[in-house]
Amino acid sequence: MKTSLKIKTYVSSNVGWSRISYKSAFLWIKGYFYNTNPKRILVALFEKQNNLSEIKKILNTINGHYGLIYQNKNIAIISVDKISSIPIYYLHDKNKKIFYVYSNSLNSSKKTGLKKINGILTSVFSMSGYTIGSETILSGVKLLEPGKFIYQKDNKLRIESFFLYEPWNIIIDEKPRLKIELQKTILRNIGNLINSVNNRPIVIPLSGGIDSRLIASVVRFLGYKNVYCFSYGSKNNFESKVSESIAKKLNFKWFFVEHTIANQKNFFTSSLVSDYEQYADNFSSVPYHQDLFSINYLKKKKLIPANSVIVNGNSGDFISGNHLPSAFLQKMDYQKTDSERLEEILNFYIEKHYSLWKDLKSNKSINDIKRKLIDSLKTVNYRFDHPENSHGIYEFLEFRDRQCKYVVNGQRIYEFLGYDWRLPLWNNDFIDFFENIPLRFKLNQNLYRETILDNDWGGVWRKIPINKSVVKPYSINLLRNLLKPLFFFSKKKWGEFDKRYLAYWYHARRVYASKSYQDIIKEKRGFRNPVSFSTERYLNRRGLDHSGKIVAQP
């Protein structure tokens, strides 16, 4: 992309951005760093600002999560990190020959008057909860993708990559050596985390699964004790009991935040949620709500210190292979042509990630999404020519669109409530390690799980259940067990019945409480999960229906 125009930036220091200068250059920056600091980054960019390959090296070696805007006379460098954890947007106004850059939520950029909705993209958004590639639902506005930066020199502007997630470029190696390397990577990452918080309290949303337990156990193994853990959900839910057992074994403070249908219903209609959604809106995904109620509760009750650093387990499960469709990938037919296999992969991916509403799925809508996904892959030199890299395209698409836009954007919760955050399982060396390991070591997270269980950090892995769930209250569990045999010949129909009539009462986080039970059981459009309703609510606020179309005015 080359053009001749001026860059105009909108940056606000009240949302965590700070400005520093060096000679004639200045740098707006937000984030945290393990191996450098803002001043060193500024000086390095100043010294290499005319050398594109050197700029790429500088950005690629920054270990941390950040957004930055560098300007010096006729040169500008605007970059996000490898997961776009702090989003930056841009808009090319061809009439005025201005290239606008926004570092804050576009809701706060009132000067630009950005209101026009991209109707084509909202149809994609309505089926997944996020957009494809650099697109947002605002016409003309783009999101700077993971690992990319804008480079302007002498009014010539281009968008470049310093990093591309390429899980199809596998490196064949043996499991014993990889397990040793993963052990070192984990210890190094958590050690960097501890050093970066400068003795401040670490607060961990601790589940009964792997990722947050890994962080908590290794933090303890490395001797850091200023740690608070919490869990949430319905009273006496099994996962919270596991969380409590882990925290007790590690000798960390632990809190429980109860979710009831009543308090969650009030939560979703509160000003807290509407204000947060305004703050966190990236116009490329539905806002992520998961920790908002609980962190706000802990803050109001003064159960965690004001200078706490929140550290969650995103997205260890994804990067280690837990989201890969094992059975599908292992059956991949390599006698078929590349185009036939690509078609199969995209069909499976769309079925998994673009199915929020059954009534929106049609041959036309699926083909439209498929075309957009294929178009977005045209600049990527992907490969799937070997059984060990057949997962590459599937994993890349989820990384770029779901993980980096939706899941990672959950860090806005902590910023909104006034806390710093860290994402140790998205650090450079963690990404680098898992990006290129063969499929056989990612399936069912076998390498990740085995390495962790072998080390048993903190003594919380072999005797405390992992990812086990028990449906409560027991009355609902009994009812489910009585009803399930009636659907013996159709597992799919049982799943639909269970979701529509029973999940409202037993889901531990009470995630369906944004709707009334009557609305749930009357729902005829075929919702997939609670994100279906979150996405509909997001679109409704913009005058759109659940399909992304403008609601007709009476």
What are these regions (language model features)?
Residues M1-L206, I210-A262:
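Cysteine-centered catalytic environments shared across enzyme families
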Residues M1-T9, S13-N14, V141, P305, ...:
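Adenosyl-5′-phosphate
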Residues L106, S315-D317, I431:
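Short, glycine-/Ser/Thr-/acidic-enriched flexible segments
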Residues E145, R177, E181, T185, ...:
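Generic recognition of stable, solvent-exposed alpha-helical segments in well-folded globular domains
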Residues P167-R177, R200-I202, V227-S231, Y276-D281, ...:
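Glycine- and acidic
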Residues K235-L298, G316-T337, E435-L439:
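ATP-dependent adenylate-handling ligase core
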Residues V286-L303, F396-E398, V407-N409:
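A conserved donor-nucleotide-binding helix/loop in the catalytic core
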Residues I295-I366, G418-W426:
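Active-site adenylate/phosphate-handling loop in enzymes that bind or generate adenylated species
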